């Protein structure tokens, strides 16, 4: 497993090429799938949550029938623990499009890791009331966790480091730093799901503090890559345990 992950996550500028912007989505911005999922996220998920009702309503808004669910379900494995495949695609769409938006921000000029990290956190603000459900889906054991959730978390970490021009680390330390950034993002989402402060001020403060903790590791990114994956898995397990406690 770790050899496969090494190939996927070793630094590669092709990962940031314009032609690959929407990978691993299997459709473009002008496709019905993209339009329906975007509409669902913007208009219906904040109220209804990540479910088929949000997708069907979005499809209806745009003049598409409920048959769009079949097209959206195609790229994913059969439903896991009562989570429909189309809903898994909606979650994937959310993760990918919000990550891709970081490239647009970076194109405007020099940006820091903190600026990009906070932008990604802010992108989840409209869904704050649905983050508990989102994190539950992301942490479900199975193919979606291995093939989508964890790879997307690592792609997010990689993009944050790449676009901010952060000092990077070679070889094994490369994995550890990305695991730490991914953990910071996951824990910030978990905090936001329970934050009741005005304008989510405490979440933003928490996000800055977690990012500072990543920076404070400095040259300590010398753990083996298995430990990096272990740490991220522990973060996902922490999410599951916290969600179970309510």
Swiss-Prot record:
Keywords: Lipid-binding, Mitochondrion, Transit peptide, Ubiquinone biosynthesis. It comes from Eremothecium gossypii (strain ATCC 10895 / CBS 109.51 / FGSC 9923 / NRRL Y-1056) (Yeast). Pathway: Cofactor biosynthesis; ubiquinone biosynthesis. GO terms for biological process: ubiquinone biosynthetic process. Belongs to the COQ9 family. GO terms for molecular function: lipid binding. The keyword Phosphoprotein does not apply. Its main location: mitochondrion. It is found in: Mitochondrion. A 1,2-diacylglycero-3-phosphoethanolamine binds at residues 175-178. This is Ubiquinone biosynthesis protein COQ9, mitochondrial. The keyword Mitochondrion applies. Residues 1-58 form a transit peptide. Membrane-associated protein that warps the membrane surface to access and bind aromatic isoprenes with high specificity, including ubiquinone (CoQ) isoprene intermediates and presents them directly to COQ7, therefore facilitating the COQ7-mediated hydroxylase step. Participates in the biosynthesis of coenzyme Q, also named ubiquinone, an essential lipid-soluble electron transporter for aerobic cellular respiration. GO terms for cellular component: mitochondrial inner membrane; protein-containing complex.
């Amino acid at each position: 497993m770790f050899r496969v992950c090494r190939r996927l996550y070793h630094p590669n500028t092709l990962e940031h090429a314009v032609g690959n912007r929407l990978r691993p989505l299997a459709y473009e911005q002008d496709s019905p799938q993209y339009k329906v999922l975007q509409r669902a996220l913007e208009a219906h998920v904040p109220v209804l949550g990540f479910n088929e009702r949000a997708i069907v309503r979005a499809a209806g808004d745009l003049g598409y029938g409920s048959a769009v669910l079949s097209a959206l379900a195609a790229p994913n494995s059969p439903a896991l623990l009562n989570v429909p495949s189309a809903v898994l695609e909606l979650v994937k769409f959310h993760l990918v499009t919000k990550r891709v938006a970081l490239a647009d921000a970076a194109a405007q000029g020099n940006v820091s890791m903190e600026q990009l990290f906070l932008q990604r956190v802010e992108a989840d603000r409209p869904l704050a009331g649905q983050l508990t459900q989102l994190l539950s889906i992301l942490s479900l054991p199975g193919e979606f966790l291995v093939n989508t959730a964890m790879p997307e978390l690592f792609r997010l970490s990689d993009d944050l480091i790449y676009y901010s021009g952060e000092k990077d680390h070679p070889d094994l330390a490369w994995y550890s730093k990305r695991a730490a950034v991914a953990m910071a993002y996951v824990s910030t989402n978990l905090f936001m799901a329970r934050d009741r402060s005005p304008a989510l001020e405490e979440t933003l403060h928490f996000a800055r503090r977690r990012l500072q903790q990543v920076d404070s590791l400095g040259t300590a990114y010398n753990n083996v890559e298995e430990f990096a994956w272990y740490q991220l898995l522990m973060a996902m397990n922490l999410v599951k345990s916290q969600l179970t406690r309510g």
